[in-house]
Amino acid sequence: VQQLQSQFPQFKINDLSPILDGMRLIKSKEEIALIRKATQIAGLAIIEAMKSTAPGVYEYQLDAVAKYIFHVNGSRGDGYASIIGGGTNAFMGHYFHKTDVLKPGDLVLMDYAPDYHYYTSDVTRIWPVNGKFDPAQKELYNYIETYRNALFKYIKPGVTSDEVLDKAAADMEAYLVGKTFAKPHYLKAVQE
């Protein structure tokens, strides 16, 4: 913006964020249908990635499977950069490298959705490389599901995202007591 202003000082530049933000808040029936279709395609892609998961498969190969499903279902491509991580990469937040091989005993996290007529969704799933959750993985999966439900409980008009996060975190404190992944050595690994 500053570069444009310096090149064209005779023009006034206005911040359209308030107008655009307002437009993003309310969706037409047609827009909602496009978002739903993007979500359905994301679901199909993740299911195919799950079916393709096995020890020895690379993270980028799951990306390719999902991208293929996007395209054969009418998508132009990615709605955003894919997050696909196995093992410790699944817990690195926004992990984009997709270069590691999946190993037995690992979990895979995929956060990915298509661009469908300029609309997307946000779908994240986690599953075991072996195809079946072991007890510790199941415990972690149940925690994630419980936390998601706690978040949804507080999402309401007028409640800020920080308030939602704070209330859900407070709900989850008691849930964490005694959980395997809440032990100090796991928490230290997450912080590192």
Tell me the role of every PLM-derived stretch:
Residues 1-192:
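Active-site neighborhoods and metal-handling regions in enzymes and metal-associated proteins
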